[in-house]
Amino acid sequence: IYPALAIREILARRFTFSSGYVGVSGGMEEKIVSREADIAFMGVRAQGMPRTVSKDWLTFPFRNAAGIYDAFRHLKQFKPDLAVTTGGFVAFPVLAAARILGIPAVIHEQNAAMGVTNRIFAGSAAKVLLTYASAAQEDGKKTAKPDLTP
């Protein structure tokens, strides 16, 4: 949440734009982002991929399919020129909907190892920004170390 808000703050110093934040409805994102008066919060249904065999495997595909629909609807209405994500399971429906709608995506990976969602969408992203070189994918075609220090 905070890396995305920091990226937005840095971009806002250089450009004028409207921004929205897509996060899990009722989740931590909604509580934090709702305090920001100039950011539209758009809720989606999403669920992280279960790491062990459990009943969550039954709901996982359906909740994320619903999340793609939610994100598709929000992005179609908001009409962004760019989708910027910072990973996590909520990025999956956003990146999937952005790909369907032809909206370029920039992925920012702030961890030393790239997460599952970022690995899945790195190949189709317009750019992948890394904090650590160790997070680069083997092909290394779409990665760059960002300089986002204010």
What are the language-model segments listed below?
Residues 2, 88-90, 112-116:
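Residue-level detector of alpha-helix initiation sites
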Residues 11, 15, 78, 101-102, ...:
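Helix C-cap/helix->beta junction micro-motif
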Residues 20, 83-84, 106, 129:
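Structural detector of well-ordered beta-strand residues that form the stable sheet scaffold
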Residues 27-31, 80-101:
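An aromatic- and histidine-rich active-site surface loop
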Residues 1-12:
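Short amphipathic alpha-helix
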Residues 53-82:
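An amphipathic, basic-hydrophobic alpha-helix
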Residues 12-63, 145-149:
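Conserved nucleotide-sugar phosphate-binding/catalytic loop shared by glycosyltransferases and other
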Residues 39-40, 99-150:
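Active-site-proximal region of nucleotide-activated glycan assembly enzymes
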